[in-house]
Design a protein with these regions (language model features):
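Catalytic nucleophile-loop/oxyanion-hole region of alpha/beta-hydrolase
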Residues: 92-98, 121-152
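Alpha/beta-hydrolase-fold enzymes
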Residues: 157-250
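Short alpha-helix in the alpha/beta-hydrolase fold that links the catalytic acid
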Residues: 267, 281-290
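Conserved alpha/beta-hydrolase
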Residues: 96, 103-127
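Catalytic histidine-centered segment of alpha/beta-hydrolase-like enzymes
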Residues: 304-317
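Short beta-strand/loop motif that positions the catalytic acidic residue
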Residues: 265, 271-273, 277
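Catalytic histidine neighborhood in serine/cysteine hydrolases
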Residues: 290-307
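An N-terminal hydrophobic leader/cap segment in hydrolases
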Residues: 1-63, 69-76
């Protein structure tokens, strides 16, 4: 596991054969994991039953919006008086396997965790790193919630990194949620996406290439101060897409004005934002978020870059503490 050791084991699992054996998600059934699925969990450190032997781990797919969405659910025993369930929404190019440290921290703080791979990411179906419309992300979230509503414990909390944060912003604004109607009691946004950095130039480039290309090569930026994490993404993670899909940028272009013109809502959010983030236009995005939500608590991290969930250890500690403190209120 990249965050535990410098030596990365060669993955003795293969995405296609894992998918062939995936079962529907049902936390009422205790299934034995296949040897290959155990190897996948070990590769990303999702084998958290080693650190937390009392935790039950369930996984499988949910059919949502034409997709088969891979769901991971970690459940504490009743005897530990769990505080509810944290939903984790990952960012663009990410997957649940990169969020193990956050899952670990939530379990340690007494929360169950539910996390799923977005369409086009990880073990979920869909064209890699593509989406037809950001409405698909909303439909998947609402179908996942509907599927698990009677199967997992409340209250619910949510944390989203980057595009995951965008999905939560959209959920709250498009449904005009307030404190009474939202499925989530508390929401934390980590380096949330509204506009990416260099948005004007990106739109011009997109207009030029859209008639000719379906994707362009991904550049792996230094979006974290954790060199081990960056090396893992570039060199060792078999679930990393190597190209940006033009459809995703097309969808983002439609989504940004929709969010920026949305009516404000009476809901509080906590935003954690690195001031060295070169991925999103964070100053603009914070202004938009302040205008949209009744109360916005900001935790700025002066040396923080974009991938806050996988930042250098001291910065990551501040990020995780803010999340847990917000949910524990």
């Amino acid at each position: 596991v990249y965050w535990k050791t410098d030596t990365i084991e060669i993955p003795n699992w293969d995405r296609h054969s894992l998918l062939d054996r995936l079962e529907p998600f049902d936390p009422a059934i205790n299934r034995e994991l296949s040897v290959e699925m155990e190897a996948y969990c070990r590769f990303y450190g999702l084998d958290l039953w080693v650190e937390h032997p009392e935790v039950a781990y369930h996984q499988g797919y949910i059919k949502a919006e034409r997709h088969e969405v891979m769901v991971h659910y970690f459940r504490l025993p009743e005897s530990s008086a769990p505080k509810g369930t944290v939903f984790i929404l990952h960012g663009y190019f990410d997957h649940v396997g990169l969020y193990t440290q956050l899952i670990d921290r939530c379990l340690g703080a007494g929360f169950d965790v539910l996390a799923y791979d977005q369409p086009g990411h990880g073990l979920s179906s869909g064209t890699p790193a593509a989406i037809g419309s950001f409405l698909e992300y909303q439909a998947v979230l609402s179908e996942v919630m509907a599927h698990v509503r009677d199967k997992i414990r409340g209250p619910w909390f949510a944390v989203g990194q980057s595009t995951g944060g965008a999905i939560l912003i959209d959920y709250l604004l498009s449904n005009h949620h307030n404190r009474e109607t939202s499925d989530f009691r508390r929401v934390v946004l980590l380096a949330p996406l509204v506009r990416p950095m260099g948005w004007l130039g990106a739109k011009i480039l997109h207009s030029l290439v859209k008639p000719f290309l379906t994707r362009w090569r991904r550049v792996f930026g230094a979006n974290s101060g954790n060199a081990r994490f960056l090396d893992f993404l570039r060199e060792h993670d078999p679930l990393q897409a190597r190209a940006v899909h033009v459809d995703w940028v097309t969808a983002l272009r439609k989504w940004v004005p929709h969010i920026e013109s949305a009516r404000p809502v009476d809901f509080p959010v906590t935003v954690v934002q690195g001031e060295k983030d070169l991925t999103v236009d964070w100053q603009h995005n914070l202004r938009i978020i302040r205008n949209k939500f009744a109360s916005v608590r900001e935790q700025r991290i002066p040396d923080g870059r974009h991938h806050l969930v996988n930042e250098a250890q001291d910065l990551q500690a501040t990020v995780f503490n803010t999340i847990i403190d917000t949910f524990a209120e």
